[in-house]
Amino acid sequence: VSKVKNKKMINQIALKSLKARKKRNLIAILAIVLTSVLFTALFTIGGSLIEKNQESTMRQVGGSAHAGYKYLTKSEYEKVAKDKGLKSVSYRIELADAENKPLIKVRTEMAYYEELEAKWSFCYPEEGHMPKKENECVASDLTLKALGVPCKIGEKFSVDFSVRGKKYSKEFILCGWYKGDRVSMSQVMCVSKKLVNQLAPTAESYQYGGDIAGSYMVDFNFKTSF
């Protein structure tokens, strides 16, 4: 194959060719740029939609943890917490469902939540703090609205509930509140650990479908989600 030694001439020909096709080349460049922008936007929007869908599903089921166990005793929880294969473990202790008439259509579960569990369960207070005193509680704005209670720290209100066949009507002080989600199966009222231990000491065993007051609901994340 013969080689052309005059590089200057080749460059001139190439330059003239580019100038002759200037508009066509410009259109091609614009098409490439627009295609790149389109695919970037497509992947960004698609990723955002997937993330929103996942969050919506998590809110419906009431938690973002990878997995969990229900109705455990304290000793069973401690065994799970020691599992080195897990990245993080947290829990809540069940107490009861609120029974006030205004809450018939706004189901509200009462339980003690660890801070991490509250964050996983979308009930960590947006304003205020987690319960510390025996009569403090955190509630959703939806529960408070149904009860006619303003979302204001320090508000006092009574909640009716039953634990192991015994009825209670207790006055709580609002120490925190969060924005509830209507797609959730239930709203949450976080109460103090002292109250739960007082009214519903953890039993030695629990059976599905039985009385779950005092049982540990344990959630955890694996070291990898794959």
Predicted regions and their residues:
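N-terminal Sec/SRP start-transfer signal
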Residues: V1-V37
